[in-house]
Amino acid sequence: MLWVLVGAVLPVMLLAAPPPINKLALFPDKSAWCEAKNITQIVGHSGCEAKSIQNRACLGQCFSYSVPNTFPQSTESLVHCDSCMPAQSMWEIVTLECPGHEEVPRVDKLVEKIVHCSCQACGKEPSHEGLNVYVQGEDSPGSQPGPHSHAHPHPGGQTPEPEEPPGAPQVEEEGAED
């Protein structure tokens, strides 16, 4: 039984990302830093009026390094990469008005709102756990359902456009500015 437990847990421990590095021996006077900076983000969608919202962006300097390899390889490759990225975020629905579109007079966009940033392993996938807990409507919390894709009429004739799931690239975004 113990071997089964060790056999199941050991691979997970080996694949876990290493902890972020705050100092390097080669540069003892330098420290990694990462923080959330306030920005104004422009949320847009084709055929709709863009909306400015207050958000945060992650900005910082985290350590990465790569030590030259040898062939044949005698030890593991020494490569490490940390990046300044969201450590805590929530999702908010931003409703865009689409004048002249009677079938779809408004579009709901799901926008990630960054709360806190930190240096994390570069390959780490962002976590979307608790998405339903953190989704809040722009006008009044709980009064609007989130974007979803199925065909049925909505109150006021509103039919949300199908959205990509969180984490999918948002090609329609017009970007962020300071």
Curated annotation (Swiss-Prot):
Membrane-spanning intervals of the chain: none
Keywords: Disulfide bond, Secreted, Signal, Tumor suppressor
UniProt feature, compositional bias: Low complexity: 140-160
Signal peptide segment: 1-16
Superkingdom classification of source: Eukaryota
UniProt-listed Pfam families: DAN (PF03045)
Domain CTCK residue range list: 34-123
Assigned protein family: Belongs to the DAN family.
Role this protein plays: Possible candidate as a tumor suppressor gene of neuroblastoma. May play an important role in preventing cells from entering the final stage (G1/S) of the transformation process.
Record protein name field: Neuroblastoma suppressor of tumorigenicity 1
UniProt organism field: Mus musculus (Mouse)
